[in-house]
């Protein structure tokens, strides 16, 4: 209770990634304390996970095992983020990028990981819709991203922000709480006079139709086939044009693949790192294909309340143009 800290650990279960558990007063729900733990593997640029480490261990804590059981409270961001980060560093390394740029990417990666877990310590839900906040043209505009962030909430599982033209590279990850985070924290933590509290809370809630405050948690995300219907509530995506962003990342992966063997094959050493990088990039292809495929047959959901005068219908099928575009991207890559 006295100290709330961030622990950097090297444990027997590196696959758990990172956690930000908290404990609360059972009578009031008030959060009394919390700690963030980051496993060295998740926070490092090391690409290889030793096969000796299983993804479930009877000796591991309940919190760690929750990560591998589709538990509603589980958070697998560290592993998702690590794969995205390795894609970015591999892209930089095969193109002989300035080490300072790679260092900046690593720093932003760690910032984001800690911010996400800190959000959990404050009681925030995952928000897998917030990565839709910015348009593709704004993603690398640091005048915007350093003011309000790359995404609406640090509680998302976003794709790394990579520019195909390195001279235009902006932030790789958001490094500050987004508009949704600030809004949710204001609702949950701001103190009001007892007489005005209800009216003030309703005033905060009335802003829910602001596009920058878009929300969709684990119950609505489409990471698993056959689950949910709104393709905007998805992991490993980025920007208001998730299809276009995925296509850009397909191009990046395809540009990396021919250079892998020359970069990561070393005389007298095993193929472990080459294999790991190759598998990681194929995993990214799978993620991008998943993002694009969700637009085929998808339905956009709007949960505005009666009286909010929303101009958006509760259910809007993804347009024929978008669905056709998604299929074309899948066929091409």
Give, region by region, the residue ranges found by the protein language model.
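Metzincin-family zinc-dependent endopeptidase catalytic domain
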Residues: 1-121, 149-150, 160-163, 185
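Short linear motifs at secondary-structure transitions and domain/linker junctions
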Residues: 8-14, 129-133, 316
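Poly-acidic low-complexity segments
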Residues: 25, 39-41, 111, 127, ...
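Alpha-helix termini
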Residues: 42, 46, 129-132, 136
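Conserved catalytic/binding loops enriched for acidic/polar residues
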Residues: 93, 101, 105, 131-333
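Catalytic Zn2+-binding segment of zinc metalloproteases
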Residues: 118-134
């Amino acid at each position: 209770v006295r100290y709330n800290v961030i622990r950097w650990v090297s444990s027997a279960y590196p696959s758990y990634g990172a956690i930000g558990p908290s404990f609360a007063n059972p009578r009031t729900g008030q959060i009394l304390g919390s700690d963030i733990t980051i496993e060295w593997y998740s926070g490092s640029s090391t690409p290889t996970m030793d096969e000796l480490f299983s993804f479930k261990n009877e000796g591991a804590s309940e919190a760690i095992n929750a990560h591998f059981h589709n538990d509603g409270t589980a958070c697998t961001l560290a592993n998702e983020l690590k794969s995205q980060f390795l894609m970015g560093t591999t892209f930089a390394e095969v193109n002989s990028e300035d080490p300072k740029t790679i260092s900046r990417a690593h720093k932003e990666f760690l910032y984001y990981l800690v911010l996400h877990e800190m959000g959990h310590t404050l009681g925030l839900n995952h928000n897998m819709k917030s990565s839709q906040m910015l348009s593709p043209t704004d993603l690398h505009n640091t005048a915007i991203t350093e003011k309000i962030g790359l995404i609406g909430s640090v509680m998302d599982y976003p794709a790394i922000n990579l520019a195909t033209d390195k001279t235009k590279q902006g932030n790789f990850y958001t490094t500050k709480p987004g508009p949704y985070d600030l809004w949710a924290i204001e609702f949950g933590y701001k103190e009001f006079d007892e007489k005005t509290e209800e009216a003030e809370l309703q005033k905060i809630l009335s802003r829910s139709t602001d596009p920058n405050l878009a929300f969709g948690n684990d119950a609505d995300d489409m990471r698993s086939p056959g689950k949910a219907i709104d393709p905007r509530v998805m992991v490993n995506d980025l920007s208001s044009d998730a299809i276009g962003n995925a296509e850009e990342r397909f191009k990046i992966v395809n540009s990396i693949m021919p250079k892998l063997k020359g970069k990561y094959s070393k005389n007298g050493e095993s193929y472990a790192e080459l294999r790991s990088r190759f598998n990681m990039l194929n995993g990214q292809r799978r993620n991008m294909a998943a993002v694009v495929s969700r637009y085929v047959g998808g339905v956009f959901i709007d949960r505005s309340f009666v009286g909010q005068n929303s101009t958006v219908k509760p259910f809007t099928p993804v347009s024929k143009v978008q669905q056709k575009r998604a299929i074309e991207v899948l066929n091409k890559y």
